[in-house]
């Protein structure tokens, strides 16, 4: 009883009210910028470019997305500069490898992309969990996480295809980045056209895991956020 009363008093305290009002006034455009960067990355990768330079450009786009997510989530400057350092090291190493004559740096660079795109959802979710209000900013952040998950799996499939000795897909030997991106989002949304299927056991297991996580995320997180946003609007 004492703990419940203490929690109630904290929520009703002026400082708590001020914090809630401050969160409500936080601009939604910050996660909107993250969303725009994700759409730009998606459009670039889906256009079907090929070559080592594609992975370098993807590092730039994913690095910018991670930095925007860190800024939108209110992360510390130390974490922000650490992310900048990782991106710069990856770009310098990848560019140097191309200049010295390394024929294929796609695999290592897409592993770096996997790290960057995997860190961004963690940062965003950590920020959203701490929020006391559900508003447009919260919903935009949750949508960013959903798209980031699809890109994370596409980079994971790309890495498997790059390092594996056998083709990733049963229907195609030389898959492009666009093919992996297409397969990932078709799997996550459970559309499942069937024109691409994973050939190996690891690819199939990850595809099933992506479909499960994607559907659970939609029917629980997004649905609950949107419904709560609607109730708040009617109550106000």
Q: What is each residue range found by the language model?
A:
Residues 77-89, 106-115, 134-145:
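Cytoplasmic-side transmembrane-helix entry/capping segments in multi-pass membrane proteins
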Residues 1-26:
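Short, Lys/Arg-rich, polar N-terminal cytosolic tail immediately upstream
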Residues 47-62, 83-84, 106-118, 178-181:
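Structural signature of hydrophobic alpha-helical transmembrane segments
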Residues 49-51, 152-182:
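Outer-pore turret/helix-boundary of cation channels
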Residues 117-165:
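Pore-domain transmembrane helices of cation channels
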Residues 27-42, 84-89:
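Alpha-helical transmembrane segments
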Residues 42-56, 69-78, 99-100:
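Short, hydrophobic transmembrane alpha-helix segments
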Residues 174-235:
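Pore domain of cation channels
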């Amino acid at each position: 009883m004492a703990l419940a009363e203490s929690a109630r008093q904290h929520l009703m305290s002026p400082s708590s009210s001020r914090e809630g009002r401050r969160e409500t006034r936080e601009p939604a455009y910050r996660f909107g910028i993250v969303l725009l960067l994700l759409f730009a990355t998606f459009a670039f990768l889906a256009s079907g470019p090929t070559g080592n330079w594609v992975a370098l450009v993807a590092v730039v786009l994913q690095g910018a997305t991670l930095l925007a997510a860190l800024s939108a989530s209110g992360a510390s400057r130390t974490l922000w500069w650490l992310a900048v350092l990782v991106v710069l090291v990856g770009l310098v190493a990848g560019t140097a490898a191309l200049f010295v004559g390394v024929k294929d740096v796609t695999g290592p660079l897409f592993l770096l992309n996997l790290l960057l795109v995997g860190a961004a959802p963690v940062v965003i979710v950590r920020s959203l969990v701490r929020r006391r209000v559900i508003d447009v900013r919260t919903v935009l952040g949750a949508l960013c996480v959903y798209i980031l998950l699809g890109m994370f799996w596409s980079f994971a499939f790309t890495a498997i295809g790059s390092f594996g000795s056998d083709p990733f897909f049963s229907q195609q030997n030389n898959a492009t980045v666009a093919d992996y991106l297409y397969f990932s989002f078709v799997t996550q949304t459970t559309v499942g056209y069937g024109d691409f299927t994973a050939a190996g056991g690891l690819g199939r297991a990850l595809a099933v895991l992506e479909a499960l996580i994607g559907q659970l995320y939609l029917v629980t997180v997004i649905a609950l956020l949107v419904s709560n946003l609607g109730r708040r609007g009617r109550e106000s």
